[in-house]
Design a protein with these regions (language model features):
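Residues within the DNA-recognition helix of helix-turn-helix
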Residues: 48, 438, 513-516
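Tandem amphipathic alpha-helical repeat scaffolds
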Residues: 1, 5, 30-41, 66-82, ...
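Residue signature of alpha-solenoid helical repeat architecture, marking inter-repeat boundaries
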Residues: 23-26, 30, 59, 63, ...
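Single-residue signature of alpha-solenoid repeat helices
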Residues: 12, 45, 85-86, 124, ...
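Amphipathic alpha-helical segments of tetratricopeptide repeats
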Residues: 17-21, 50-61, 74, 91-99, ...
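Helix-turn-helix DNA-binding segment
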Residues: 411, 460-463, 469-515, 519-524, ...
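TPR-repeat structural position
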Residues: 9, 42, 62, 82-83, ...
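Generic long, charged, amphipathic alpha-helical segments
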Residues: 356-422, 465-476, 498
Length: 540
C-alpha cells in the first residue's frame, strides 16, 4: 500500500504479485490491478479488476465489488474502446450497488452510473446533483467530486461553459489536495478537464492545471494516454507545436498494440497539427481510413480547404452543422457546432459565396453570445471581419480588432496571426503602411510557428504591397523541420520503412524527404548522410 501511495508502481506490483501467490483475495487483486494501471498495462489491469470483482462477490463485499466493476468499466470502455464491455460492467456495478438501497452512500454511485448512460441532459443533470448531495451527506469525496466533474461536463455541453468549467476546477482542487482515493476517479476528472478545455479552446485553464497538478501526475503516473491526446490538441491550439507532437505521438504509440479507437483519436489530432503546419500530404496520409471517426470533421474539413477542395469541405461541414438559424440557438449548439461554423465561413468565402458566408457568420455570432467564451466570440468577430473584407461593406477593422483581442486573451497564437493577416488585407488600400506592419507581424508569427502555408500567404501580401521580405533558407540550415527529423533517424540506422513508421508518413514521402535533404546538403547517399549526422553530433 505504501508503494502505491508513493507512486512506486513497480514495487507495488512486485509486492502484490507475491501476496497473490499466498491469497487470491479481492483486496490483493484490486491493489495489483491499480499497480498495473499505473504502469499503463491497461489490458492486464482490466483483467485483474474483473478477478477482483469476482473475489469480492465471493467474499460478499458488494461495495468493493461495485468499485472493481466500475474500474473495469472505465478501462474497457474509456481506454480500450470496448463500449459494449463497458456497458456490461456498468450495468453489473449498478445492479450490485442498488442492493444497498437509497439510504446508503452506494446509491450515489448508482446515480452516477445512471447519469453516464442517460441521453437527456436535463435528467443527467438532476441525477448528478442528487449524487453530489449524497456524497456530501455521507462524507464520500469520490462520489461528490466525480459527480461534480461530470456535472461540469453537462453544463459545458449545454452552453453554460464558464459555470461548468468552474465545477471542473473545484473537482481538480479536491483531487490535488488528495481528497479522492479511487484511481479511476482521478483519471476521469483529469480527462474531463482536458476534454472540456480542448472543446472550448481554454488554453490558459489547461495550462494552469497541468502546472498545479504536475507533482501529482508525475508521482502517481495518472492521466491515461488517451487523455493526453486531448492535451495534445490543447497544445496545438496554444501554438506549442513541438510539445503537441510529443504528446500526440506518445499517445498514438502507446495504443499501437491493437487499441485502435484510442490511437485514432491521437492520429486525428496529429493530422490537424500537420494541416496547421502546411504539411498537407502527411495530414492526408494520417487521415486515410479515418473518414468516419466521430472526431475527424474539423481536421478533414480543414485539410480539404487547404488543398483547394472547397466543395468537399462544404459538403462535410453542411452535413454536420445543420441546425436552427433562429434567434435562439439550439441547446449545445455553440459548444459543438460553433468552431465548425467558423470553418464553414472560410469555405464559403473561398468559393465566393458571400451570401451564405454572411448568413453563417451571423449564426455564429448569435451562438457565440450564448456561450460567453472568448474563443468563440473572437471566431465570430473574425468571420464577420472576413465577410466585410470580401464584400467591401461594413467596418471590418472593428470586427478584426475584436477578434485580435479575443484570440490574444485566449492565448491562441495561430488565430492571432491569421487575424493580423486579415487586418492587413482590410487596410491594404486605406492605410498601406499599417497593413505592411500587420502583415510583417503575421509573417513573423507564422514563421515562429512553422506554419509554412500561412507564411507564404503573408509573404505574398507583403510583396503585393511592395514591401521587401526575406527569402531563401533561414540561418545556417536549409532543411525543413521534417527533413531534419528524417536526417536524424538516418543517423540512427533506421531504414525508410522504419522512418515512415516512426513519423507516421508513407515510404514514398520518406523517399522524397531523403532526396531533398541529400540535395540540400550536397550528399550522395544515405551512408554519407549517416556520416554527416555522426560528424556534426546530430541526435534525435
Amino acid at each position: 500500500m505504501a508503494a502505491l501511495r508513493d507512486g512506486d508502481a513497480a514495487a507495488a506490483r512486485r509486492a502484490f504479485e507475491l501476496a497473490l501467490a499466498e491469497a487470491q483475495s479481492g483486496e490483493v487483486l484490486e491493489r495489483l490491478a491499480e499497480a498495473l494501471y499505473l504502469e499503463r498495462e491497461y489490458v492486464t489491469s482490466a483483467a485483474h479488476y474483473e478477478r477482483a470483482y469476482a473475489a469480492y462477490r465471493r467474499e460478499r463485499q458488494n461495495l468493493a465489488a461495485g468499485r472493481a466493476a466500475r474500474a473495469a468499466a472505465w478501462i474497457t470502455g474509456n481506454i480500450l474502446g470496448d463500449w459494449a464491455v463497458r456497458n456490461g460492467w456498468l450495468a453489473r456495478a449498478r445492479t450490485i450497488l442498488e442492493e444497498a438501497g437509497e439510504g446508503r452512500p452506494e446509491h450515489g454511485w448508482v446515480l452516477i452510473i445512471r447519469a453516464f448512460s442517460e441521453p437527456d441532459a436535463q435528467v443527467r443533470e438532476t441525477l448528478l446533483r442528487e449524487a453530489i448531495a449524497i456524497g456530501r451527506r455521507f462524507g464520500d469525496p469520490d462520489i461528490e467530486f466525480l459527480a461534480l466533474a461530470y456535472l461540469g461536463g453537462v453544463l459545458v455541453m449545454t452552453d453554460r461553459v464558464e459555470e461548468g468549467m468552474v465545477l471542473g476546477d473545484e473537482s481538480l482542487a479536491a483531487l490535488c489536495a488528495g481528497e479522492l482515493t479511487e484511481l479511476a476517479s482521478v483519471d476521469e476528472i483529469f480527462c474531463g478537464l482536458f476534454w472540456a478545455c480542448e472543446l472550448v479552446n481554454d488554453v490558459p485553464r489547461a495550462d494552469q492545471w497541468m502546472r498545479a497538478a504536475a507533482d501529482r501526475t508525475k508521482r502517481s503516473n495518472v492521466v491515461a494516454a488517451f487523455c493526453r491526446a486531448h492535451y495534445g490538441g490543447i497544445l496545438t491550439a496554444a501554438g506549442r507545436w513541438q510539445e503537441a507532437e510529443v504528446e500526440l505521438k506518445q499517445a498514438a504509440r502507446h495504443f499501437d498494440r491493437g487499441i485502435s479507437a484510442r490511437r485514432d483519436a491521437a492520429i486525428i489530432r496529429l493530422a490537424n497539427l500537420r494541416v496547421r503546419q502546411g504539411r498537407l500530404e502527411e495530414a492526408a496520409q494520417l487521415l486515410t481510413g479515418l473518414e468516419q471517426h466521430p472526431d475527424v470533421v474539423p481536421a478533414l474539413a480543414a485539410l480539404h480547404l487547404a488543398r483547394g477542395e472547397a466543395a468537399l469541405a462544404r459538403d462535410l461541414l453542411e452535413r454536420v452543422t445543420r441546425g436552427s438559424d433562429d434567434e435562439v440557438p439550439e441547446v449545445g449548439e455553440s459548444t459543438m457546432v460553433g468552431p465548425l461554423l467558423a470553418l464553414l465561413v472560410d469555405v464559403y468565402l473561398e468559393e465566393g459565396n458571400l451570401d451564405d458566408a454572411e448568413r453563417v457568420a451571423q449564426r455564429l455570432g448569435r451562438i457565440a453570445e450564448a456561450q460567453h467564451g472568448p474563443y468563440l466570440r473572437a471566431a465570430a468577430a473574425l468571420a464577420m471581419g472576413r465577410v466585410c473584407v470580401a464584400s467591401g461593406t461594413g467596418d471590418p477593422r472593428r470586427y478584426l480588432q475584436q477578434a485580435l483581442e479575443g484570440f490574444a486573451r485566449a492565448q491562441l497564437p495561430m488565430e492571432v496571426a491569421r487575424t493580423r493577416l486579415e487586418l492587413a488585407r482590410a487596410l491594404s488600400e486605406r492605410s498601406p503602411e499599417v497593413a505592411i506592419a500587420e502583415a510583417k507581424s503575421a509573417l513573423l508569427d507564422f514563421e515562429r510557428l512553422e506554419a509554412a502555408r500561412h507564411a507564404d500567404a503573408a509573404g505574398a501580401l507583403l510583396r503585393s504591397l511592395g514591401a521587401p521580405i526575406r527569402t531563401g533558407p533561414k540561418g545556417t540550415g536549409a532543411l525543413t523541420k521534417r527533413e531534419a527529423e528524417v536526417l536524424q533517424l538516418i543517423g540512427t540506422g533506421l531504414s525508410n520503412p522504419e522512418i515512415g513508421d516512426r513519423l507516421y508518413i508513407t515510404r514514398k514521402t520518406v523517399e522524397t524527404h531523403v532526396g531533398n535533404l541529400l540535395a540540400k546538403l550536397g550528399l550522395r547517399n544515405r551512408a554519407e548522410a549517416a556520416a554527416f549526422v555522426a560528424r556534426n553530433k546530430i541526435s534525435p
